[in-house]
């Protein structure tokens, strides 16, 4: 496998890993020795019949299309803004707006375009005629980076998700609508004169972020048959098409290999993105020879330019694929061990949690003992802590994947299962809130004693319960044989945490946790229905606003019996319910009534009286 570059040396060192995992009768095929210099260069493709697609290329369409010569008045406001239009760092809406300083959400300067504004202007033919290749590429780049950064910010930052949910949803809708609009215009051919492979790569990449796989395949199949079909055969574009075609089974593996082989020439450099995706697909198909060929091809490019980020990223990605997707566990484990080492690789491998959880799952399926799997999990967790990985995202994903696989193997609390769970907890390099929350969320065992012991770990390990912790505990109590009073105590502890955190209202997530532990608790739902209705009757006015209350009641319409019961709280001054219990509201510092629930929700019950019959 690895051509390791010795520190301070000019020559590469070939270690023995390739010879260990690659059949001795095979030969390693590498690409050209020409230097890779650009991630947007275009690679020749001379076969005009690709799996039945007739590729048409005008001689004027090569690589980046030429800019149109248009005479425009100097006073044209859009042309003046286009002259200054550049790729800008994206800032999510919920970070732009600060209620304390009254900052505006959209603080784009007059010299730039917002995503929404540019998307709307694209509908205007006059505006489209003013665009050149750079303008369109910058817009596509801003779409792509905006989508990536917005999602990364939401996943990695500690924010009030109830508060930010609407703005985050609105931003996602803006970005998704914009890329779909751009995709539609590109498919009509109206932007062919300013279209380039690098722009298409950003468009396909954005569609991929939204998992719009059908749109990717449809755009590619349309584009490859157009007058600029050669642009759709650029290696960076094909890298995404191959991935999506494989995931959706639009292309089988033989067809993917045909696309790859027909797009590669022996004397031309293979784009690292294409080598990366082909290597990943090959690993998933169990074709390790092809995957290792792709890896060695990338190592050739690395030796020519050790600082090329696209090559380094592609090497790391194929490495991860061997760990997470290889069913040959001997190969997967060798790549895993190399990835955990801080030294010894010429590229940096970020041990991404989804690949690690897949590796753990494959090890269990492949017959590794649970003790061995627990040790792998322990070492990954330790690695994350040492590398200062974000605990909220990476560790949460890792723990969720591990415990999911663990409880799939041990769905019942046998002695062996309990001992192994204790071993996992004792082996964990750090028992923190993320680990305990994830463990309790995935626990299928309806054993009150075990559940309570896990809850005690918060105190034993000095872990402070957050609002999320209290919600998870309340929700998971649905399967535990608690009394109504014990469920009510968990509810009160949640409210106490909300009040301590400065919440003035009971959020939807809190009502959802209560509903799960009572009305939706399966075998306990009958005895806990009265508890739910009693709590709702007391705290109904503590909802966030009128909209939240209306949506709350509307969500019950799908359950006719429950809707009739809950509607009594709106329609009756003092409704009586079977199994009702006494609920006292303590003194709060922050939590308070915000609405008149009965008055607000009357519009829901009045909308269709037949539902109450």
UniProtKB/Swiss-Prot annotation:
Tell where it localizes.
Mitochondrion inner membrane
* Stretches with biased composition (Low complexity): 25-39
Which keywords fit this entry according to its UniProt record? Membrane, Mitochondrion, Mitochondrion inner membrane, Phosphoprotein, Sporulation, Transit peptide
Transit peptide residues according to the UniProt entry: 1-58
For whether the record's keyword set contains Nucleotide-binding, the answer is: no
| GO BP terms in the entry | filamentous growth of a population of unicellular organisms; filamentous growth of a population of unicellular organisms in response to neutral pH; single-species biofilm formation on inanimate substrate; sporulation resulting in formation of a cellular spore
- Describe PTMs of this protein: Phosphorylated. Phosphorylation promotes binding to RNA.
**Tree of life domain:** Eukaryota
Q: What is its main location?
A: mitochondrion
What InterPro entries has UniProt attached to this entry? Answer: TPR-like_helical_dom_sf
Q: Where is this region: Disordered?
A: 15-39
GO CC, one annotated term? mitochondrial inner membrane
- Give the membrane topology, semicolon-separated if more than one: Peripheral membrane protein
What family is it from?
A: Belongs to the RMD9 family.
Q: How does it assemble?
A: Monomer.
Q: What does the UniProt record say this protein does?
A: Binds the 3'-UTR of mitochondrial mRNAs. Involved in the processing or stability of mitochondrial mRNAs.
Q: What name does the UniProt record give this protein?
A: RNA-binding protein RMD9, mitochondrial
- From which source organism is this entry? Candida albicans (strain SC5314 / ATCC MYA-2876) (Yeast)
